[in-house]
């Protein structure tokens, strides 16, 4: 049998071995060589250390495609080493081999990977496997780095710091995105006021403000304020300049035009991040730094609610609102108190509860049971429970004939009010009757056993108890949403029917709810007094 090695003896008596051409040697030992041997031959031929060829694709195809493990050299450096029949010229590789790719192929989508671990992680997208579980909220992830980034939301860790402004971020990509605001020059200049912008879209939005300025210069400035106030109510903003911003920023106007007309801005009119907001809502004039924030805000005007609850069908405009709502169905309480171990569904409820553990919370502690309350108002509401319990015990003692309980029963009877008619109420104090115009909350005769709140009517107590029981007997026939009170269902159905029964007598605009009409009528009070309806005159 021919051998790929030829031997010779030198003059010093030592045997020397001569190695033949690598391609012929490879053809000879291809059937017996292992993958490691072939890799060593390639590295010796190319003159590269093992670290430079490690991880590069050397095998293409899978056992399902070729009927076995297929081995092929690299198209750039290892083409001369491909096994071929002696005497034939080396031809080009097939397209499947020269296209490159990884050693490991996904059987579901055909994507190739150079490492087995990469293929294993990729296959979790097809199987849905998420082996990394968060110990705080129970959310699972397919990769460990995603879990590490998620846990920073619970711990509040922000390891990435901006060297320019020392602002910190929980993810590196957020830091890189933020650093562009420092490095990117403001090359887009407004020809009218010479204000500079980093993005072309910011300049276009700013130029729209100039167009509005030219139109607004021909109208009264007070009319502009009233129009902006009317749009502001639909945006759920409070009266006045929002968050202390200057009026020209709030209205989306140009600062130079605002200064030329001698209009005085607010006291806090320093240049700051609020004045660099580029995305302005066309409906109410509110400005935002990010396009995503403006997109979410515009759902207030359009009424879009793309996030639906799979349990009850209720829709929300933002995903965090849906997440908090789902905890009502699952019972999840991801926010525990570090002092007493009590858990809450929302973080704001936890912060409110933590006030009871502060040193000053001793002043709002119940003297009967020792329970701490977040405020004195909550303490008074809590003490009504003890008062109601004492009244019920005294009344039951009178019915059972317990001696010495008549005095307590007389006290209990003195604080019970019995309505006598629509003109007023009669109360019994010190054995005398007198008419009262208002019944104090402590003298209402129907008391809730859960929270101690009192009511003058049994129907009001029945409606109130649905808060504790969760009963919602009034269902919408269109979307299935349920309500605890019928008036709430009536107002909700106007969203489906489009009915607007409350009309403005000044401009004829219709509203679904009366409170929206009353807010709107404040716009007309500067020019003409609104005509009160029959319900407002009462």
From Swiss-Prot:
It comes from the Eukaryota. GO terms for cellular component: nucleus. A zinc finger (C2H2-type) spans 104-126, 132-154, 160-182, 188-210, 279-301, 307-329, 335-357, 364-386, 446-468, 474-496, 502-524. Transmembrane segments: none annotated. Disulfide bonds: none annotated. It is found in: Nucleus. Signal peptide: none annotated. It holds the Pfam family zf-C2H2. One of its GO terms (molecular function) is zinc ion binding. Its main location: nucleus. Keywords: DNA-binding, Metal-binding, Nucleus, Repeat, Transcription, Transcription regulation, Zinc, Zinc-finger. Gene3D superfamilies: Classic Zinc Finger. Residues 35-73 are annotated as: Disordered. InterPro entries: C2H2-ZF_domain-containing, Znf_C2H2_sf, Znf_C2H2_type. Belongs to the krueppel C2H2-type zinc-finger protein family. PANTHER family: C2H2-TYPE DOMAIN-CONTAINING PROTEIN, ZINC FINGER PROTEIN 200. May be involved in transcriptional regulation. This is Zinc finger protein 775. It comes from Mus musculus.
